[in-house]
């Protein structure tokens, strides 16, 4: 037996079978660094239509987690796909660098600002810490294969950014949106500062729920209100509250004029409850022998005076629109300094706004009985005192949703303090923002309703904070009237110039006289700006000023929590400073959870870190998982899920390797065959690739990365792996090296590889770079500078063997393979090349198959295939799952060709080549080799 190995076209490529990504990717990154690849992209696409995806700044504190990785990878995929579409799509990373988390880290090492360390040195340490964190996170983002202007990122602590924030504030003030107010705001006792809406998260909390008796001072007036002559016992207005600690600040009781109220006799006293709540409230009190004496409307009760339950203080009953009879008692305890509705009612009726609680959460010295106590700890003492005073009607516990600090996870309080606000009403900001939301494209579409609801209901934006590490609110107010300095805008621009040279420290270290001359009349505000103002100003500080970018951004892409965060603050800053929305389109992705849908938590032990993934599996596996997951909802990840992703990756890599290995010796400059002259199956492969490319580009344009991933996988495993590549192996390996059949397949493979590597490039950035290096090409451009492949062709409309035709052939082939599997299990044949396949077909199917002539066997990967009419089918044939078709498979008895392994009666016909078939002899000995028309 001769050795025909040297006569075969064995596959050969530099593209390895194993990815070994964890080791290879850093080398590829190093290559990109040396090439200056991002700079080259910018130069190559300069002058093209821009596409700007504006990066929402992550916070510069700690290593990135998998949520950060998902966000940056999705952005990178979109940017790279837009580059392939020919856009100039720059990506400038940003970081959020001021605020409390950084202060807390610095405090751990150096102590509190102004105590163990000077405020100036504290800020220097904060700046140093933030810079270090940026470098740590930057390294991780780059390791993920994310391309961007990493050398010139935007940091909110950059001097020019800090200065431009002040200029943005000046525009907002100039446009009349700033207001000063004494209002209740969410206050964190741990932060020692007011919080913005975006910094508040709701969590379940168990609180005391008590019903408190307020004794009515004038019983005769109450009797009159209920249409009675007199009352012979004491009467009490009953309020229900879950915040006993606010009772020292109580100044009134609110009822609703439109509601009905009942006077109820219980033993030797009366109580007042909303009529609709009587039954459930008495049930809660476990009182059965109560008697409803009379009913009246809320407006008859207003003006009646009650007595505070433990202070000598008159408490009026007042009308409040916010009062309902859905729960509680229908009478609402009102502490003007501890609630928005309470505050509004207090302002309306000129109630006392005395402050009873300090910023640290302890009662102030003027709080009788409880001075110095921490408010939440005082709840029990207050309940105990109410019991002693016979003013406690009922005491219980309730589990309810309660506002917490997003950083400390501790309960918040509403606390009225003097603060600076961006008014939602003064210049119609709320309505303008709502209109801008309507003019923006939101995906998923429910995002629009979500942010609309938030903007409709949100209070004025409290932009002042009482922090050390933050951009100043550099205002000057009159010492007596507290009015803003008349030259505020001019002063702010002067401050901005100073900050641009020396950072925020230039303001904090300066004397007032450096900015104003009237220091006897005016004083500087010592507050800092809310950090959400920092990130919210990015459209003004970056997009509006950087000529490499554009305003508004084409796209904002962040987690779904940003409807209440960055999407909203960006909108409010842009609308109040510039009068237009900062984005055209807003996309959101879900949170990353484990395979059981649980949040990542160290305590649960279910944290998957991006560092672990790229150090073991490789960044491309993380990128493929990200792209493959429908990110509009929660994104589940685990070791098992990543293992499945790695399996998918291997299939994609193997497909690429097979394609590349069959391009050995192919020179695109000289070997490409025109479409019309290709073997018909190769024409199909190119047309099918074109069909998939159109779908893939459409999916990329819609940011549907999971659809892209599904299409690429289907293309590689089904259209290529299970059909085309399976069929052409014989032709590729055994045909004449430079003969038409092989060059035809190589031409198709060349086009397929050039399309496929571009489809993969946004997602599998490292692998695509590897594929590109191993691909024959006529360009020196790196893959990152390429656009979608234009060498593909579709069938003409009048093509006889079009995509529809080949789809039917694929169906028939699948049925043949099904029957083959049956015969394998029956030990009739071991492999398809041992099979003699007879297809019995009705008229329509016969017409389809006869076009392939004697090349049908190549499509079925068998040594012999016969086509007969259905009427000739035998009892041993098996009916196909296609009407009008049955299949018979028997073992072929002819000898095996030692070169192509086909069974053929022609083996040994040539005495010089006794162990190979005539087809192989032709491919070895003739100049042209065999000919193929269809497969």
Swiss-Prot record:
It is found in: Cytoplasm. Its EC number is 6.1.1.5. The keyword Cell division does not apply. One of its GO terms (cellular component) is cytosol. Its cofactor is Zn(2+). ATP binds at residue 602. A motif ('KMSKS' region) lies at residues 599-603. Binds 1 zinc ion per subunit. It catalyses: tRNA(Ile) + L-isoleucine + ATP = L-isoleucyl-tRNA(Ile) + AMP + diphosphate. The keyword Transmembrane does not apply. Monomer. IleRS has two distinct active sites: one for aminoacylation and one for editing. The misactivated valine is translocated from the active site to the editing site, which sterically excludes the correctly activated isoleucine. The single editing site contains two valyl binding pockets, one specific for each substrate (Val-AMP or Val-tRNA(Ile)). This is Isoleucine--tRNA ligase. The lineage of its organism: Bacteria, Pseudomonadati, Pseudomonadota, Gammaproteobacteria, Thiotrichales. The gene is ileS.
